Amino acid sequence: MTEGRCAQHPDGLDVQDVCDPDDPRLDDFRDLNSIDRRPDLPTGKALVIAEGVLVVQRMLASRFTPLALFGTDRRLAELKDDLAGVGAPYYRASADVMARVIGFHLNRGVLAAAGRVPEPSVAQVVAGARTVAVLEGVNDHENLGSIFRNAAGLSVDAVVFGTGCADPLYRRAVRVSMGHALLVPYARAADWPTELMTLKESGFRLLAMTPHGNACKLPEAIAAVSHERIALLVGAEGPGLTAAALRISDVRVRIPMSRGTDSLNVATAAALAFYERTRSGHHIGPGT
């Protein structure tokens, strides 16, 4: 491999071979585990990083347009059909060079970097939606990514963020979501918890998930609103939903538990609620 060589791939791809880990063309992929220099920090470059073939494919299918890709020759071969017509360069390097640039060995073998795009309003993402997940205080990126993956697989139409939520475009959230954080529509509430009232006025029934013993059991509560538009409210690990969010909700619902367990991981609890919604007749469409 010749350092700096630009190769016009047979499929018309812009493939550029890189052997020097200090090559400035790779700066958008540098120090991915750094606390203060990582390129996906909203206060820094604010890039969206896709990691692995499947997540890169989902980025290519999303509204986030890659600025560049960085990976091995093996991953290039796997992605060549997906990259047809993509104008971004593919910086081809060895696994060792990749590790020295990003700061660790990447088994998945390919990264893509995209810029952020303007986010829609809550009104825009819930227009036409029948099932919406509303998150409050979900500040763990892995939980957030899992919720997006669950939402995609279980026919949730959109995600709304209340106060205190993590960044859905953080690399770990995107990776754990398997790229669905780039595809499932989401919006951040500009006025919380007032926008919960806006959802109610738009025809949504607000179902607040809580471990409180006086709440309705989840299966019965979901079945009772099977023909209505619903917003499933999920709170932070530990404290759960705030008193204000619970007060505005229409129904408080709980997952029946056993063996003295009072609650489940927030992503698991959300998945159960999403699944109950599909069991009640809400359509599960073809996968992405």
Swiss-Prot record:
CDD domains: SpoU-like_rRNA-MTase (cd18095). The keyword DNA damage does not apply. Residues 1-20 are annotated as: Disordered. It is an enzyme of class 2 (transferase). It comes from the Bacteria. SUPFAM superfamilies: alpha/beta knot, L30e-like. One of its GO terms (biological process) is methylation. GO terms for molecular function: RNA binding; RNA methyltransferase activity. Keywords: Methyltransferase, Transferase. Gene3D superfamilies: 3.40.1280.10. This is Uncharacterized tRNA/rRNA methyltransferase Rv0881. It comes from Mycobacterium tuberculosis (strain ATCC 25618 / H37Rv). The lineage of its organism: Bacteria, Bacillati, Actinomycetota, Actinomycetes, Mycobacteriales.
